[in-house]
Structures are given as C-alpha cells and as structure tokens.
C-alpha cells in the first residue's frame, strides 16, 4: 500500500475505496507524498580504518577469552576482538563456538573471510613459521534481535575462538555501539580501500531538502550515518 519512500500508491486508494464501500466514508487524508530529488554522486574523500576507529571510540576490555557484547556493557553495534598469535603454528582453521551474528576476520589488517550465524561464510586458515607472529582482528556485528520464542535471551558477539581444536586466549575487545562517532579522526582518502573503514563525504544542499535514495555501487556490507545518525 505504501512505497519504499512511504508514498501512497494506487493500491492504497483501491483498498481505501473498498473500505468506504463497505463501512462508510473515511476521514480525509492530511498527508502528501514527499518531494524527491537526485543529488548526484557523493565523493567520499576521507577515511578512518576500523582498527584506528576502535581505539578512538572505545576503551579496550581485556579478557582471557572473547566475551559476548552484553558481558562488556554493550548491546548494539559492533565489537572488535583483537589478539596476537606467535609462531610456529601449523596450518589451522579459525573456528568459533558461537557467532552472533556476523564475524569478519582480518589478519594483519587484511581481510581474509567471514563467518555468519545462519549461513555458510568464508572460513579462514593461517600458518606461522618460528619467530613469526600475526595480529588477528575479528569484527563482529549485531544484526538484530528477536523478541519472542526460545532465542529471546539472544547474546551477541563471538564466544571461544579455536585454531583447529586448540582454544586461543588473550583478547582485547573494543565495544563500538556507534551511537556517537564524533571522536573519529579522518585522513584524506587516496587509492583503493582495502580494509574495513569509515568513509566520509559532504553533501551541500542549498534549497529545501528533499527525500533521496542511496545507491552504493561497489560496496559490500556496512551502515550509513547521516549527520551522525545511523539510518
């Protein structure tokens, strides 16, 4: 009955007509469809990597094992789990006892794969020679909660990380609910973006603001904030 923009569609008026034919006249509408406008291409000229952002937005919580978001005082948004692994280490797959809801894995800042709660992801394996080490970062996203049924007490985040069958201990966790990102410090963006990042651009509107739509060609997964508000 309503479009994606909340506009009244022909189907709405047909349903309204049928209701009036059977139950009498309805009150007159006082709403109108909103004006729309195309504002062209928005250049994202500034960037802050998620690894830098975590240190700007959160105080790290250290724990032997990864904790759920609720256990570190967080309820929405993202948590970055970070650890350093020393070699030597034979080829090992990163595994989780629980992923709620999407975990993206980076090794030394480079994207390697993702895990999801409800579908197959891209499992990640790694190996280290003697004297080598690497930093493993896991960016976990809370993708929403249900408010009914057996999963109503749903916890978010990751729990118990293993390399094959061996549990790994010693983690720093950075809670990022993203309700306030004003502390972020951006740098000029040059070249291709190769890791998870906050990107910023500016849209100047001289006349009365209109509704518009975002088309995110080339992007994969993320969120959009307008003047700091997560839409």
Describe the residue ranges of each PLM region.
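Solvent-exposed beta-strand/loop surfaces of large extracellular or lumenal domains
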Residues: 100, 106-123, 226-231
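Aromatic-lined ligand-binding clefts that engage carbohydrates, nucleic acids, or primary amines
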Residues: 91-106, 136, 203-227
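Edge strands and adjacent loops of beta-rich recognition modules
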Residues: 48-82, 175-201
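Glycine/proline-rich low-complexity spacer/linker segments in large multi-domain proteins
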Residues: 141-174
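Short, well-structured beta-strand segments enriched in hydrophobic/aromatic residues
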Residues: 127-145
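Intrinsic-disorder/low-complexity, polar/charged segments enriched in Ser/Thr/Lys/Arg/Asp/Glu/Gln
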Residues: 78-82, 91-93, 110, 121-123, ...
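The feature marks the first
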Residues: 73-106, 112
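Extended substrate-binding grooves/exosites of carbohydrate-active enzymes
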Residues: 1-64
């Amino acid at each position: 009955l309503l479009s994606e923009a909340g506009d009244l569609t022909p189907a709405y008026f047909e349903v309204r007509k049928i209701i009036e034919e059977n139950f009498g006249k309805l009150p007159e509408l006082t709403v109108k469809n909103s004006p729309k406008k195309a504002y062209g291409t928005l250049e994202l000229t500034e960037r802050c990597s998620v690894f830098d952002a975590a240190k700007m937005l959160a105080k790290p919580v250290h724990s032997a094992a990864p904790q759920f978001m609720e256990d570190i005082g967080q309820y929405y948004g993202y948590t970055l789990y970070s650890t350093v692994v020393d070699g030597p280490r034979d080829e090992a797959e990163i595994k989780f006892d629980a992923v709620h809801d999407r975990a993206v894995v980076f090794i030394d800042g480079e994207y390697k794969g993702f895990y999801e709660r409800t579908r197959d992801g891209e499992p990640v394996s790694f190996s280290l020679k003697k004297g080598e080490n690497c930093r493993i970062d896991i960016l976990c996203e809370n993708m929403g909660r249900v408010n009914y049924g057996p999963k109503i007490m749903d916890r978010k985040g990751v729990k118990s990380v293993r390399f094959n069958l061996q549990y790994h201990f010693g983690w720093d966790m950075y809670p990022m609910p993203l309700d306030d990102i004003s502390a972020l410090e951006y740098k000029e963006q040059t070249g291709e973006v190769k890791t998870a990042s906050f990107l910023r651009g500016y849209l100047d509107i001289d006349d009365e603001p209109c509704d518009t739509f975002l088309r995110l060609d080339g992007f994969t997964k993320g969120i959009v904030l307008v003047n700091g508000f997560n839409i």
